[in-house]
Amino acid sequence: MTSRFMLLLILGLVVTVGAISISDVAFAKKIASLTGDQVVPPVSTDAIGHATFKHPNSSTMNYKLNISGIVHPDKIDIHAGKTGKNGEVLVDLMKHAKQQATKVGVIVTGSFNASDLIGPMQGKTVLDLVDSMKSGDTYVSVDTQKHPTGEIRGQIELANSPSSNVTSSIKVGNNTSTS
């Protein structure tokens, strides 16, 4: 009887740990480092940025962008497209965004849900967008008056580890600040 109990206990732990691991991967952070040389065609700019995307549940995506060298972005969007390719807008991140000016640029935060998805993602779910993000099929673009088709851009990718504590960072000259 004791060995049967131990077997059931071990199986229960394996199932629980497996469920936690699957959940961690499903809701892992997505990140993007934005630069002018990733824009298609590339642009010359000192602006840079870092974006972090988290989805605390299957219907909501939260985001934070730290942008240096741009004070007033005109548009910030998630697009469909692999590295080196332009694509359609999937989400207008400025629609629900809050902007906070910094000494070197702006911090943009917000969230969206499935009703905010447009273009090829219209009618789909946030998890469908997450699948595209995991596949490397999405990028973030920040447009300005000077560069209306994109001043900085970055492919969205899965953070190094689902359990890692990803911080947003901005490199300014030789200094890096994190938040």
Describe the predicted segments one by one:
Residues 8-21:
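Bacterial N-terminal signal peptides
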Residues 1-3:
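N-terminal secretory signal peptides that target proteins for export/translocation
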